Swiss-Prot record:
Protein name: Transcriptional repressor FrmR
Pfam entry (one): Trns_repr_metal
Effect after changing residue 64 to A: No change in activity, does not impair response to formaldehyde
Family statement drawn from the similarity comment of this UniProt entry: Belongs to the FrmR/RcnR family.
Role noted for this protein: Formaldehyde sensor. In the absence of formaldehyde, mediates repression of the frmRAB operon. Acts by binding directly to the frmRAB promoter region. In the presence of formaldehyde, it dissociates from the frmRAB promoter region and allows expression of the formaldehyde detoxification system encoded by frmA and frmB. It senses the toxic chemical formaldehyde directly, with no metal-dependence.
Induction: Negatively autoregulated. Induced by formaldehyde. Also induced by acetaldehyde, methylglyoxal and glyoxal, albeit to lesser extents. Markedly induced (41-fold) by polyhexamethylene biguanide (PHMB), a broad-spectrum antibacterial agent, but overexpression of the gene causes no change in PHMB sensitivity. Not induced by S-nitrosoglutathione or bulky aldehydes, such as furaldehyde and tribromoacetaldehyde.
Gene: frmR
Compartments reported by the entry: Cytoplasm
Coiled coil: none
Record text on activity regulation: The presence of formaldehyde leads to the formation of methylene bridges between Pro-2 and Cys-35 residues of adjacent subunits, which remodels the surface of the tetramer. These conformational changes lead to de-repression of frmRAB expression by promoting disassociation of FrmR from the frmRAB promoter region. Can bind Zn(II), however Zn(II) blocks amino acid residues required for formaldehyde sensing. It is likely that Zn(II) could only inhibit FrmR activity in vivo under conditions when Zn(II) homeostasis is severely perturbed.
Keyword match Glycosyltransferase: no
Keyword tags: Cytoplasm, DNA-binding, Repressor, Transcription, Transcription regulation
CDD domains: RcnR-FrmR-like_DUF156 (cd10153)
Keyword ATP-binding part of the UniProt annotation: no
Length: 91
């Protein structure tokens, strides 16, 4: 879980954006929108959820392995590399 107020604010902003996308998707489904438009909205929700997951996971990894400079520069670089890989996978 994000530990700083700034990180928490970013995560909550993402959650609210996803909520807005879900609400728009629901309205589209209720309004019998075209399948193409609905699929596009679903893809946007999925992308936003993956972004949220990456943000929270990055925060967790950094809190667990990269706090207070107690590890070597090599470990810090490994943490950065791992986060980069996770973000690429979730795109």
């Amino acid at each position: 879980m994000p530990s700083t107020p700034e990180e928490k604010k970013k995560v909550l902003t993402r959650v609210r954006r996803i909520r807005g996308q879900i609400d728009a998707l629901e309205r589209s489904l209720e309004g019998d929108a075209e399948c193409r438009a609905i699929l596009q909205q679903i893809a946007a929700v999925r992308g936003a959820a993956n972004g949220l997951m990456a943000e929270v996971l990055e925060s967790h990894i950094r809190e667990t392995f990269d706090r207070n400079d107690c590890y070597s520069r090599e470990v810090s670089q490994s943490v950065d590399d791992t986060i980069e890989l996770v973000r690429a996978y979730l795109k």
